Amino acid sequence: MELQLAIDLLNKEDAAELANKVKDYVDIVEIGTPIIYNEGLPAVKHMADNISNVKVLADMKIMDAADYEVSQAIKFGADVITILGVAEDASIKAAIEEAHKNNKQLLVDMIAVQDLEKRAKELDEMGADYIAVHTGYDLQAEGQSPLESLRTVKSVIKNSKVAVAGGIKPDTIKDIVAESPDLVIVGGGIANADDPVEAAKQCRAAIEGK
């Protein structure tokens, strides 16, 4: 089981500083969509240039022109790139092909997908590396969690890894870990903690069953 730190609300310098503080406890560091909107792909490059021994994910949330956008993210140092599960099949297939020919990985974000079971099966057959169930900020505010969606997707896929994101914190991560996802994505639960290093350490301990 892997742990990913999602960083959304910092500038690229502070993001790299935070990532380096917690890198002993995480496998993947994400440059979140808000940072990419604010600072562009150079934020991904800054992270890739300033951290070692962890993968860098660019949360592009691609919807179209997929092979080009994947290739650009890779050019700027991304190891993992995200595309939306609601994108056209042709876009997702092109994104997977572009990532794989560069020995990189593609994560498909299931935010706003209505028929999770059907789409997860399709994405699994397409060869997505990760299928991520994601309760976004707006639904978290309504009290929703990704647990049920995680169970649904895990029950139908055969090859892809299952990732889970959405309001996960050190004090709630054990409920998620109990469902055995392949990748647990924690954002504010680490980034906004009073002691991010301790929060990351607690999350790592939870996924290792300690």
Swiss-Prot record:
Pfam families: OMPdecase. InterPro entries: 3-hexulose-6-phosphate_synth, Aldolase_TIM, HPS/KGPDC, OMPdeCOase_dom, RibuloseP-bd_barrel. It comes from the Bacteria. Its EC number is 4.1.2.43. It catalyses: D-ribulose 5-phosphate + formaldehyde = D-arabino-hex-3-ulose 6-phosphate. GO terms for biological process: 'de novo' pyrimidine nucleobase biosynthetic process; formaldehyde assimilation via ribulose monophosphate cycle; L-ascorbic acid catabolic process; one-carbon metabolic process. The keyword Lyase applies. Keywords: Carbohydrate metabolism, Lyase, One-carbon metabolism. One of its GO terms (molecular function) is orotidine-5'-phosphate decarboxylase activity. Pathway: One-carbon metabolism; formaldehyde assimilation via RuMP pathway; D-fructose 6-phosphate from D-ribulose 5-phosphate and formaldehyde: step 1/2. It is an enzyme of class 4 (lyase). Belongs to the HPS/KGPDC family. HPS subfamily. Catalyzes the condensation of ribulose 5-phosphate with formaldehyde to form 3-hexulose 6-phosphate. This is 3-hexulose-6-phosphate synthase. It comes from Staphylococcus aureus (strain NCTC 8325 / PS 47).
